[in-house]
Curated annotation (Swiss-Prot):
Function: Catalyzes the carbon skeleton rearrangement of L-glutamate to L-threo-3-methylaspartate ((2S,3S)-3-methylaspartate).
UniProt binding sites for L-glutamate: R100, K149, H150, D171
Record has Isomerase as a keyword: yes
Family: Belongs to the methylaspartate mutase GlmE subunit family.
Name of the gene: glmE
Protein name as annotated: Glutamate mutase epsilon subunit
Any one GO MF annotation of this record: methylaspartate mutase activity
HAMAP family assigned: Me_Asp_mutase_E
InterPro entries: Cbl-dep_enz_cat, Glu_mut_E, Glu_mut_E_C_dom_sf
Record note on quaternary structure: Heterotetramer composed of 2 epsilon subunits (GlmE) and 2 sigma subunits (GlmS). GlmE exists as a homodimer and GlmS as a monomer.
Catalytic activity field: (2S,3S)-3-methyl-L-aspartate = L-glutamate
Necessary cofactors: adenosylcob(III)alamin
Length: 485
């Protein structure tokens, strides 16, 4: 049976929305008309999607920084510093973990303690507890577009408050913000929650407000094979556009090998457009984001900044639209220090130097791109074959049987049988394919690549390869070579 895509009827959705927000009527004013008027009152340069479109016209790769302060004034100060000193083109606000998990009362208590002590005590910004009125101060006081980054499998209330406040971008999805983040939340629930979120975005789009919806590409950010991330981004894109989302960002979290990083983004762009065309989704704007290295950084500062430089160079030649810049002190309690600014300026300088340069799609990139597309196509085809008209149901079954499998994910709804490792060139391959629906040729290809590394390093093929690869980059290496004693 062919896949059936059906947008929730507007009146039906508004009734669903009314019933949902009834539980939070004392929390905020959820008037859509007021929110739409506020968005329309903002200048174009504060709208995330409009600025992306301008950067495409200007053939310019944009930089994006992030901040995670609990206190409002600290957050605004930090964001403005990243814009004025670090020259960031876009900014993100990281939401605290209590809000991500819908524990708003816990966030409220710690926010109150933070205000009393004049110190950020949460690991992010508790947007819902501040409410729309105070959140609009951020929009008004910061001169660049702002995105909400979170990690919530149920982002309905968070996105409601974000859009009401004037934010014009956020990331996530029913798969990408569940499987890598949560242990016990079912895909059925998270996919349904994000169906609400996507339809809400559709309502704003129908009223002339451009909202950028980024698919969260890094997943666990631990040796995720490109075909896994690309497959999930394709599926989440289809589910989003079904509900009226018009502006989507897709991307790559740096894998490590230059050829594979460039190839994976090329493969993703081609495949996304192919599936949008296949299902006759028109007028969908696709942009790309390259996430600098998300794993551990070397402890030595110069080595850490070398990794920022390496990431930027790859992003430059991938011709992405936007780079999500990382802070080498990523896990510090707050990010008011200079390391984020240093990363921004370093990234900006490399982009300025390399702006008019390019790498032609030489043979190795084309080969790897086609390899990723073959793997992705076989995963997607298997999921579609089990659809019975319902894509969400097929996605749930795909994870249950390991047709889709994210390495090192905490979710009990993820099979966790597939195991990755790098080959001798540092490309991510499959040490154990698990239940991924690959043909024998693909399986042979990966076995050969892993065997080549084994012979080159004179080591056994086992899980120790994977462990070594996980920690290699934090030691300033792409591959941690350990030969048999």
């Amino acid at each position: 049976m062919p896949i059936t895509f059906k947008k929730i009827d507007k009146e039906d959705f508004l009734e669903i929305r009314k019933n949902f927000l009834e539980n939070y009527k004392n929390l905020d004013d959820f008037d859509l008309n007021t929110a739409i008027r506020f968005h329309k009152s903002l200048p174009d340069h504060k709208n995330f999607q409009k600025k992306i479109e301008q950067s495409v016209q200007d053939n310019k790769i944009m930089t994006q920084a992030h901040s995670k302060e609990t206190l409002l004034e600290d957050l605004i100060k930090n964001l403005n510093t990243f814009y004025r000193v670090g020259q960031a083109d876009f900014l993100s606000i990281i939401i605290d973990s209590h809000t991500r998990e819908n524990h708003y009362d816990n966030a409220k208590v710690i926010l109150e303690d933070s205000i009393k002590s004049n110190k950020s005590l949460l690991n992010g910004f508790p947007l819902i507890n501040y409410g729309t009125k105070l959140a609009r101060k951020i929009i008004n006081d910061v001169e660049v577009p702002l995105q909400i980054k979170h990690g919530s499998p149920d982002a309905r209330l968070l996105v409601e408050v974000a859009l009401l406040s004037g934010f014009s971008a956020f990331d996530g999805g029913g798969i990408s913000h569940n499987i890598p983040f949560s242990k016990s939340i079912s895909l059925k629930d998270s996919l349904e929650n994000w169906k609400y979120v996507d339809r809400l975005v559709g309502i704003y789009e129908e009223n002339g407000i451009k909202i950028n919806r980024e698919i969260f590409s890094p997943l666990t950010a631990t040796l995720v094979p490109p075909a896994i991330s690309n497959s999930i981004q394709i599926l989440e894109t289809l589910l989003a556009v079904e509900q009226g989302v018009k502006n989507i960002s897709i991307g790559v979290a740096q894998y490590g090998n230059i050829t594979q990083d460039i190839a994976s983004l090329l493969a993703l762009k081609e495949h996304i457009q192919f599936y949008l065309d296949t299902f006759s989704f028109k007028d969908i704007n696709i942009s790309t984001v390259f996430n600098q290295w998300i794993g551990g950084f070397p402890e030595e500062e110069l080595k850490a900044y070398s990794l920022i430089s390496y990431s930027t160079t790859i992003a430059l030649f991938s011709k992405t639209n936007r780079i999500f810049v990382k802070n080498i002190d990523e896990y510090a309690k707050n990010s008011l220090g200079n390391t984020m600014i240093n990363s921004l300026l370093l990234t900006k300088t490399i982009l300025d130097i390399g702006n008019n340069q390019k790498i032609n799609n030489y043979e190795e990139i084309i080969f790897e791109k086609e390899q990723i597309k073959k793997e992705t196509a076989q995963i997607i085809a298997k999921i579609f074959s089990r659809c019975d008209g319902d894509l969400r149901k097929a996605i749930i079954e795909a994870f249950e049987y390991g047709v889709l499998d994210v390495p090192f994910a905490p979710s009990k709804y993820n099979l966790g049988k597939m195991m990755p490792a790098r080959d001798s060139e540092g490309m991510i391959r499959y040490l154990d394919i698990g239940n991924l629906p690959f043909c024998p040729l693909i399986e042979e290809f990966h076995n050969k690549k892993i065997k080549e590394r084994s012979m080159k390093e004179n080591r056994e093929i086992n899980f120790q390869m994977t462990i070594d690869d996980i920690f290699a980059m934090s030691q300033g290496k792409l591959i941690n070579k350990k030969s048999r004693e």
